[in-house]
Amino acid sequence: MEAGIVSYGAYVPRYRITPTEIGRVWGVDGEAMGLGLNVRRKSVPAPDEDTITISTEALRTALVRGAIDPQQIGALYVGSESHPYAVKPTATVVAQAVGATPNLTAADFEFACKAGTAAIQTCLGLVGAGMVTYGVAIGTDTSQGAPGDALEYSASAGGAAFVIGKDRVICRVNRTVSYTTDTPDFWRREGQKYPSHGGRFTGEPAYFRHVTECAHRIMEAVGTTPKDYRHVVFHQPNGKFPQRVGKQLGFTEPQMRYGLVTPSIGNTYSAAALIGLANVLDHAGPGEKILVVGYGSGAGSDAFDLETTDAIDSYEKVYGRPVEYYLEKGVEISYAVYAKFRGKINMGGS
């Protein structure tokens, strides 16, 4: 495959809340909940942050790092399940904000937490076919769980943007494979504020089945085994699931080290695997093989066999903040501030 990753950027809001603080309000042992999920804290967007602003921040970093002219972007897709508008695309606002309009195609993608990886696949096809010079794929979410629900301990916010092209490729995409079924593990109807989920049903028949099947199929397709990869990144609805699936597939903790980011920032949904990949690329040198397996409820997985090139040595990683900054920093807030920021307090009226 000629097309690959030319540049990337990530952004995570600065505010954080811990499972302990959430549990304190609901009379639950939040510390035990956090340990069970392997989530120490999660990111919280400020009142003036949403999928549009987060996507724009991530993409601006990617464009400057790669010295890419926004007018050369021929396609821009934003994958999310928390688009600000039901009718009005996120992608057009982001494209306008970075100066990429008007000569491009743009659209919003939805497929739960794998909308971002689906956007990457689409960009790979367009670039590979010679229809566009650069394609931009963004995965961003400002996810929410109902007050007191188990999701509230992990659902967070963040985004990552990847520029796909043929020139100055820093990470080559060797193969991509998908595995998709109709599995109703997680859903939210139009007009419903918070999502519903199948509890334990979200595990074995949903996440684990799709991720393991997709991982096996891509390794079979390219003739690799777990030991051939320097890094592996899985979708991470919490910190526990990716560790478990990695062990089942035969990967080691060192291979998962940089790709596992949820324990520090929570589940960023469409951005989860992509922020993990961005962190891997922050630390990677030339010739390192990477396996990425995303997952989206409903349900499906997209897997990518990647390998960094010599160009990553000269790639301008210093612009913008590395993912590690977001994993280590943050301003902790109380549940009261969190509820205010996320609109969880119903003030009445329209």
Residue ranges and their predicted role:
Residues 10-11, 79-84, 111-116, 139-144, ...:
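Acidic, glycine-rich active-site loops and adjacent beta-strand->loop/helix elements
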Residues 1-48, 149-205, 209, 292-298, ...:
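Condensing-enzyme catalytic core mediating Claisen C-C bond formation in acyl metabolism
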Residues 58-74, 212-228, 249, 284:
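Phosphate/pyrophosphate-binding loops at sites that engage ATP/ADP/AMP, CoA/4′-phosphopantetheine
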Residues 1-3, 70-74, 101-104, 129-135, ...:
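Short coil/turn connectors at secondary-structure junctions
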Residues 5-7, 33, 62, 76, ...:
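Buried hydrophobic positions in well-ordered alpha/beta secondary-structure cores of metabolic enzymes
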Residues 74-82, 108, 230-233:
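Short glycine-rich or small-residue beta-strand-to-loop segments that form or flank ligand, phosphate
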Residues 29-53, 81-135, 244-276:
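Conserved catalytic cysteine-centered active-site region
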Residues 128-161:
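Flexible, glycine-rich active-site loops centered on histidine and acidic residues
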